[in-house]
Amino acid sequence: MPADSLEMTLCGKKGRNQVNNYKINAINAFGKTDVGLMRTINQDSIFVSTKPVGKLPNLFIVADGMGGHKAGDVASRVAIEKFVKYACTTHMTDPANILDAGIMSINKEIYDMANSNRDYSGMGTTFVAAVIAEGHVYIANVGDSRLYYIGKDIQQITRDHSLVEDMVRMGLLEKEEARTHYKKNVITKAIGVAEDKTATPDIFEIEIDNGDKLLLCSDGLTNMVIDYDINKIIRKSESIEDAVRTLINTANENGGKDNISAILISAEYTENQDSLLSEK
């Protein structure tokens, strides 16, 4: 599916889930996904909405699908569609609870889908999502797609659910060695691959300072561009859109071995942010 073509209905309102650039209530966000240079199908999907999605004031998602010729594409797209539907219909109001329960719900749906259709057998997807509310960021992740906080420096907030990350934590591998390790693509958690709690997401809550940024991305970016260069590109770029496009171009220039997805968010607060949100 072309990167700019997919439209979804957000609680009765249409929104695009591949490339978006909005400025609403001092939250700027731009996202883009690219097939890369070595793949013929883009199995990544992204979702960007600075508008409310159900009880959530905004929502940003990167999903990196896997499994079979078409199944990875289906898994990432359906995961986002199902999560948005869940967010639109749940009666819960706490962002962390919505992220946690929503991911567990879509895990079962995708698992059942994979087991009822031979073409989708073995499919699954990573999932990293973020919601900004009242100066806090609520984050959930399953797999090795990441969220970075860019303030005074760049900081990886999420922890990869991967074999090499476990090896780094056990002291068996250096962090830089993990980037090029032959098992770097082996993940230990994914949505849709099992019915049990192996898809339970990590949930984080952090504060975000005025003007700081968040980056959600798939491993197609981080395997090709080191954190230092990601930080440098974001700081030197004239806009968040320019930064995202440069990040993707750099990943392709460095080999483009996988699909590449990135969402960059900038939060700028005003005194009347809550009242502005209620007027929309």
Label the model's feature ranges.
Residues 2-280:
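PP2C/PPM-type serine/threonine phosphatase catalytic domain
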